């Protein structure tokens, strides 16, 4: 399992948008390298959260939580370059499970062991997150599943470093 990045990991507060974007893209390249290594050793790699992580900047802008789409645009350029260099790739399969708001609130109320910082913000990201992965699935059907699979899925997927796929996916997204 390739874990999500530590929530306390942050770029320098004085970093520019470009520096901040490069910081996050580098961290995600490290996660991708770990996933590729695990896949080579174990024939499969599972990542907690999409290694591209580009969805976060886009969903923030789409939900109106970041008034500018500048972070998304900056990261988009860097990530496209990472795909070209094969230091980041598109996950072969994405399980995008977005519980309803009522389920999220029930889980929160029933689990006092977690603080769930930014809970309200994350609730607002649910719809844009689904839009993000609907766009991917529309250009590469079957790459996204909407519930946890019972068994590993197989089947031919488009190349994980396919720039045409990436561009078609980005073109399919609603505007921010």
Residue ranges and their predicted role:
Residues 1-4, 44-48, 94-97, 145-147:
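A structural signal for short, well-ordered beta-strand segments and their strand-loop junctions
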Residues 1-44:
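Conserved substrate/cofactor phosphate-moiety recognition/catalytic segment
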Residues 8, 53, 152:
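Residue-level detector of flexible, active-site-proximal loop/helix-junction positions
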Residues 16, 60-61, 158-161:
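Surface-exposed beta-strand edges and their flanking turn/coil or helix-capping segments
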Residues 21-30, 68-82, 119-131, 162-167:
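Well-ordered, non-membrane alpha-helical segments in soluble/globular domains
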Residues 32-39, 83-87, 129-137:
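Hydrophobic, Leu/Ile/Phe/Ala-enriched alpha-helical segments that form helix-helix packing faces
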Residues 36, 47-115:
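ATP-dependent NMP and nucleoside kinases share a basic, alpha-helical "lid"
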Residues 109-176:
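NTP-dependent small-molecule kinase module
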